[in-house]
């Protein structure tokens, strides 16, 4: 009994020290990310901004440990962690509708950010914009209106990442639902027998259906 007690007295402080080191490491890393985001001047050029239209899908690699984890474990063709839909706001200015967990933002779920804010919160040279091949002015408007409809409903973020649950959305699910309900095309279904994971960005970058309008990433596109 005394031997077990001694071992416990030795092991518990070691475990506590390890946990403290890990916590400190992640805290310091997160603070560095916040500093980098605050000081970032990253934006699209004026020429790139003029290329955008409602209904475009915009991707980024955000700042933070969670964003890095998504990039690392998702193993996409591009190092991206988040996406949203480009719209015009009530002032006629470019903005992005997207959904974010309240662990990462002050608002949980659906939100609208000015384009420059969305870009500023992106790691440098991580932004990609894709456009659906069939995106004409009518479809563009309908996609934007449907995205705004979900924004008005204040749909919460889906922390369970369950694409069968239509009461909550994660970022790729939101984009998929908007396009699926407006264009009546299931973007996750590439062919009659091929379907991509609902958490994947690949469906919104596949050359059979999308053109990449802006690409600040250095990785090779999907073949």
Predicted features by range, described:
Residues 17-89:
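N-terminal accessory segments that precede or flank the first globular/catalytic domain
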Residues 1-26:
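N-terminal Sec-pathway targeting helices
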Residues 9, 13, 27-30, 159-223:
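Activation targets extended, charge/polar-rich intrinsically disordered C-terminal tails
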Residues 118, 146-150, 204-207:
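Residues that form generic nucleotide/phosphate-binding pockets
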Residues 69, 125-190:
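Active-site nucleophile-His-acid catalytic modules used for acyl/amide transfer and hydrolysis
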């Amino acid at each position: 009994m005394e031997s077990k007690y001694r071992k416990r007295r030795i092991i518990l402080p070691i475990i506590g020290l390890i946990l403290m080191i890990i916590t400190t490491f992640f805290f310091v890393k997160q603070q560095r990310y916040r500093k980098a985001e605050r000081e970032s001047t990253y934006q699209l050029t004026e020429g790139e901004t003029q290329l955008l239209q409602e209904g475009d899908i915009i991707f980024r690699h955000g700042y933070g440990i969670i964003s890095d984890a998504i990039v690392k474990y998702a193993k996409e063709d591009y190092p991206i962690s988040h996406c949203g839909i480009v719209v015009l706001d009530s002032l006629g200015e470019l903005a992005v509708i997207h959904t974010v967990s309240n662990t990462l933002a002050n608002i949980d779920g659906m939100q609208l950010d000015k384009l420059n804010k969305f870009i500023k919160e992106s790691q440098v040279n991580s932004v990609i914009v894709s456009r659906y091949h069939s995106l004409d002015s009518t479809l563009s408007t309908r996609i934007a209106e449907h995205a705004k409809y979900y924004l008005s409903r204040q749909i919460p973020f889906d922390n369970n990442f369950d694409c069968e649950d239509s009461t909550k959305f994660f970022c790729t699910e939101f984009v998929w639902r908007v396009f699926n309900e407006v264009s009546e095309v299931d973007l996750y279904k590439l062919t009659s027998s091929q379907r991509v994971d609902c958490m994947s960005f690949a469906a919104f970058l596949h050359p059979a259906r999308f053109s990449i309008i802006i690409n600040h990433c250095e990785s090779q596109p999907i073949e």
